[in-house]
Amino acid sequence: MNRDSRTALVLFSGGQDSTTCLAWALTRFAHVETLAFDYGQRHRIELDCRLTVLAQLREQFPDWAERLGADHLLDLSLLAQISDTALTTEREIELQANGLPNTFVPGRNLLFLGMAATLAYRRSASVLVGGMCETDYSGYPDCRDNTLKALQVALSLGLAAPMTIETPLMFLTKAQTWTLAEDLGGAPLVELITEHTHTCYLGERGQRHAWGHGCGHCPACELRHAGHAAWLGGR
């Protein structure tokens, strides 16, 4: 396979979606770096899980390891200071009057991608890869394809340099995301994602289910569970 010679920077939280996107990028680009954000998230355990995932990817997929470069962590704790959501404070997850769940952190992906583009510019990377999706998602406006296309234009103009935002999961269901992971890395990648990635909004890792660790009842766990069941049912 002829790989793209550009460097890609993957927004890598340590979850199922970003791990699948990282595998996707490693099959396509000559050099790949990773980036995470510490923004005061309630499920901060994902920052520990992502290090395990990176280590496992390097160990289990030596061909990918050759292209997997530096990992970066940026402190965006200011986001928790200016937001009041169920992802940054201890509160019940519920639907708000505007139709969005209170897990929506306003401006999060806009800030993430702006910071990622700044880092990418310094690292001579021209591709940003994110796990945003508007199919099986909670209606977050900063996950929509139109939002990200507009942001790609703004970043490219603002940096006076081409910046491409790749979203390989944008139009996939969660079941199709499991299928993509299997296509990319077979059973080993599926098992790695199941065992080591983190999705649960509450940061729960004490309970192990067929689809992975989590509380089993928050929206993120329910979506992952349903997607896994649909994937198994369609095989």
Swiss-Prot record:
GO-annotated biological processes: queuosine biosynthetic process
Catalytic activity: 7-carboxy-7-deazaguanine + NH4(+) + ATP = 7-cyano-7-deazaguanine + ADP + phosphate + H2O + H(+)
Protein name (record): 7-cyano-7-deazaguanine synthase
Cofactor note (record): Binds 1 zinc ion per subunit.
EC class of the enzyme, as a word: ligase
Similarity remark: Belongs to the QueC family.
Entries under InterPro entries matching the protein: QueC, Rossmann-like_a/b/a_fold
EC numbers, comma separated: 6.3.4.20
Gene3D superfamilies: HUPs
Keyword Repeat: no
